[in-house]
Amino acid sequence: AMWLTDALKRNDRLNAYCCHHEQAAAMSADCCGRVGDVPGVCLVTIGPGATNAITGVAEAYLDSSPMFVISGQANSKILQYQMDTGIRQKGTQSLDLEPMVSSITKYFAAVMSPDSIRFHMEKAYYSAMEGRRGPVWLDVPIDVQNRQVPEQMKGFDIPEDKKTDSEISSEALERLAKSEKPLVLAGFGVRASGSAGKLLEFCDKQNIPVVTSRGGIDVITTDNPLFVGLSLIHISEPTRPR
């Protein structure tokens, strides 16, 4: 990823923090996505550098944390040959990453030409932040890194939502009305969207108990009468029945 690293050094608008290991870099980017409102970005090198980042990416995927991974890659011709033939390796440390990381990312793309970088960057960012958030990954061959981008590039067109907020709300309220014993499971998404206050206000009006996941543990205080407990393998003392 030497040309990406060189470009990062020459850009005074970006702050780069060097980690001793790619796993630490990926986990740091994950943490940035959790506490901020934008994806943390992780830049890693080819082959083992990319595979070292996978644990941090999987962590971000499972916990719905927005994260952006950019990896260096072998020459685009070498990568294309590997993808076409299925050969395990041709270039030095070259590795076709898509089969390995597609199941733990919301979007993955190998950027095979410089004129497509705007499209992939915009689509990746949209994918990381839209709906249930998560990590995205762009793999950039070394020859593409060192080429000039054209002034005019095709961007990504944001798709229209299939359902409006009012339609989604109506559907949720309809199901809630049919429920005999409603229970709210509040997770990390409630905190990430800044909706904890609105959720608790709604549950209080409707007298609906709340159980939290590990990621949503701070959505509701443990002394709140609506708090039932913590789900998954962690056990907490529930409140008294109302």
Please place each PLM-identified region on the residue numbering.
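N-terminal alpha/beta PP-like core and its mobile active-site loop of ThDP/TPP-dependent enzymes
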Residues: A1-S236, R240
